[in-house]
Structures are given as structure tokens and as C-alpha cells.
């Protein structure tokens, strides 16, 4: 399959995982299952790309120029993209699971998921801020033991 087709397929399939995370209510485990299966598939694709093409790339991770040279190889650039897709989806899955565990509204989770999908760490930072506030306010509302 041409690399451009693999790129399009991976980029389209990951949307199903994000849609499941955003649309399926917390009480249904389907969203987690869909997202994890897609992340596993993307991780397998990543491993296959790295296994097949790693030796063909020039460059490395020692400098920005080295990384640029490494990503000049189309298959390794695709591998980097698939890496982003898989890891961001796993972070989004964790955000959803954690939001459900702490009782964070799905409506508050949605901007976090959108930002994690588009800008990775920015969405995670927003989620962590919301998580902190939610946990802090929950503690204030809990009765003190022995009173």
C-alpha cells in the first residue's frame, strides 16, 4: 500500500477512537475498547514502519538537524505521525477514564479531548488543571472524619 494511503487510513481510523471517547457516555466501556484497539493497531503499524525502514533513514535524535534528516525519509515521517496518533489517543483515553473516576462532567472533558487530539500536551495540561480543581473542590465538600 502506498505510504500516502497508509497516512490517510491511519488518520481516518483514529477519528473513530476520538469520536468514541467524546460521544459514548462514561457508563459504557465501548469507548475505551474502541480507542485501545485502534491504539494497538496504530502501535503495530508504527512497529512495522520502524522495523522496515529504520535502517534507511539518515540522522537521529542528537540535534534538531538530525531529527529533520531522519524525518526526511517519508516512511519514517509517517512513523512519527502514527506515533503521535497512537500516543495522543492513549492520553485521551486516560483523560476520559480519569474524568469518569473523579466525576468530571463529560461536557468539561470535551474541550480537553479536542485539544489533546489537535495539540497533544495543551489538551493534557487543560485536563490536569480541571482535574486539580475538581479534586480540590471535592475534598472541600467531603465531611471530615470524626465530626
Please describe what each predicted stretch is.
Residues 1, 66-80:
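Short aromatic-rich membrane-water interface segments that cap or initiate transmembrane helices
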Residues 2-13, 78-82:
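Structural signature of hydrophobic alpha-helical transmembrane segments
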Residues 9-31:
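N-terminal signal-anchor/start-transfer transmembrane helix
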Residues 16, 89-96:
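Alpha-helical transmembrane segments of polytopic integral membrane proteins
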Residues 19, 47, 125-126:
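Hydrophobic residues within the alpha-helical transmembrane core of Major Facilitator Superfamily
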Residues 28-48:
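Loop-to-helix transition at the N-terminal end of transmembrane alpha-helices
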Residues 43-59:
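Transmembrane alpha-helix/helix-exit interface in multi-pass inner-membrane proteins
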Residues 110-133:
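Hydrophobic, aromatic-rich membrane-embedded alpha-helical segments
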Amino acid at each position: 500500500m502506498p505510504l500516502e494511503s497508509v497516512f490517510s487510513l491511519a488518520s481516518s481510523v483514529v477519528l473513530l477512537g476520538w469520536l468514541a471517547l467524546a460521544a459514548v457516555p462514561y457508563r459504557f466501556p465501548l469507548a475505551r475498547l474502541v480507542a485501545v484497539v485502534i491504539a494497538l493497531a496504530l502501535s503495530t503499524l508504527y512497529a512495522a514502519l520502524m522495523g522496515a525502514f529504520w535502517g534507511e533513514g539518515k540522522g537521529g535524535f542528537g540535534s534538531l538537524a538530525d531529527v529533520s534528516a531522519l524525518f526526511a525519509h517519508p516512511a519514517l515521517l509517517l512513523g512519527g505521525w502514527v506515533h503521535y496518533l497512537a500516543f495522543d489517543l492513549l492520553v485521551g483515553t486516560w483523560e476520559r477514564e480519569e474524568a469518569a473516576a473523579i466525576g468530571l462532567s463529560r461536557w468539561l472533558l470535551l474541550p480537553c479531548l479536542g485539544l489533546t487530539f489537535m495539540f497533544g500536551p495543551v489538551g493534557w495540561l487543560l485536563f490536569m488543571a480541571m482535574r486539580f480543581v475538581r479534586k480540590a473542590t471535592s475534598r472541600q465538600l467531603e465531611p471530615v472524619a470524626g465530626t
